UniProtKB/Swiss-Prot annotation:
Heme binds at residue 446. SUPFAM superfamilies: Cytochrome P450 (SSF48264). It is found in: Endoplasmic reticulum membrane; Microsome membrane. It catalyses: an organic molecule + reduced [NADPH--hemoprotein reductase] + O2 = an alcohol + oxidized [NADPH--hemoprotein reductase] + H2O + H(+). InterPro entries: Cyt_P450, Cyt_P450_CS, Cyt_P450_E_grp-I, Cyt_P450_E_grp-I_CYP2D-like, Cyt_P450_sf, Cytochrome_P450_fam2. This is Cytochrome P450 2D9. It comes from Mus musculus (Mouse). Its EC number is 1.14.14.1. Cytochromes P450 are a group of heme-thiolate monooxygenases. In liver microsomes, this enzyme is involved in an NADPH-dependent electron transport pathway. It oxidizes a variety of structurally unrelated compounds, including steroids, fatty acids, and xenobiotics.
Amino acid sequence: MELLTGTDLWPVAIFTVIFILLVDLTHQRQRWTSRYPPGPVPWPVLGNLLQVDLGNMPYSLYKLQNRYGDVFSLQMAWKPMVVINGLKAMKEMLLTCGEDTADRPPVPIFEYLGVKPGSQGVVLAPYGPEWREQRRFSVSTLRNFGLGKKSLEDWVTKEANHLCDAFTAQAGQPINPNPMLNKSTCNVIASLIFARRFEYEDPFLIRMLKVLEQSLTEVSGLIPEVLNAFPILLRIPRLADKALQGQKSFIAILDNLLTENRTTWDPVQAPRNLTDAFLAEIEKAKGNPESSFNDENLLMVVRDLFGAGMLTTSTTLSWALMLMILHPDVQRRVQQEIDEVIGQVRHPEMADQAHMPYTNAVIHEVQRFGDIVPVNLPRITSHDIEVQDFLIPKGTILLPNMSSMLKDESVWEKPLRFHPEHFLDAQGHFVKPEAFMPFSAGRRSCLGEALARMELFLFFTCLLQRFSFSVPDGQPQPSNSGVYGILVAPSPYQLCAVVRDQGH
């Protein structure tokens, strides 16, 4: 009997490894399959990719939730995924199992764009030491530069006045408010990151916003899902460059802004902005290979703050103005409260919010109804967890369906209608139901929540203090349905802004 040579052993070794892996997989499946969440039967190779409408993900998930319950499974290509719906299941996932559900799955298209160990930013970074370091830095630095203080409030108020001036220049004319809203919220973020603001007609600002919108469009829909499910496609010459051209252009714009900031940075002086503070940390971390403070990660952190902190606020404000022209009775009541609490002379302040329950309720209802981030960024389990008595194994992608709480019929009296009374009790006091969670919760909650709340209140009250908004003469009322992308934006619309008579 001949002995097998080294060459002959290779097929045997490969077969043995595959056999062991299959036995292990079978054992694992036997352990948890009976308690794994139900879901639609996946197709070979593609899984459920073509069974979910990525152009209207919330409605697809709503139908699946009605069929399979608050916790159900999907198979996106070969990636197992569990969708979490409803307040009870969401709290279990985000809070009870928070330590085991705070991680992010790898996203191949962002790895292609430079997100890698040591330069993963904050939003997409895996849950670990680098993420904690950058989260602490971002929160503390935003606080140092005025978050929650009068200094930042004054800056936002000044920007709100610039926004009002832009509306005044076009008063009485049909206008699309979105470009002006984008510019104002961009300037707030730019003030924190670069200590600068741009004039609304600055060609650089206009180009940057156009590229940012293009970049966000590129990472929503079917194409990025296919690229993430089959990352080998990213190796096809020019395919990824063409599909992600806006992303690369936006990163290049930010890189140029950082270079400008770096040339004027004086390490001896107190930091002027977040970029200066990060550069100081880079200097401190020299020689420490474990540190996440480096030039590449600075670019990723800045990209995260711009992407997450700018269009989310401007899109919510766009919803607010559209809903005001659709509900003039609500608009008049907000203006009445503004006149009673603030008047027409002084600017709104955050301290006024506690005395304006109806305005506060309207802003929160805009967030609930607009539902601009219906599906939160995916998580991945770092250990086996249990949610609603279902066993979800380690390595499963979790998709938090935030819309399932904001439109829950058991929580909201009129979930599909704009109804500010959702946030008022019988005595007219402001109340916030537990299911209102637009900024998520737990370890991965939005780090810019306080800034977003400040911007929404100050911009909204400044605008309604100065103007009355209406549907332009001769135009039909806009639809109150959303347009789905990476954010849910209101359907395109125009409005007329009329300067209010201060003697009313």
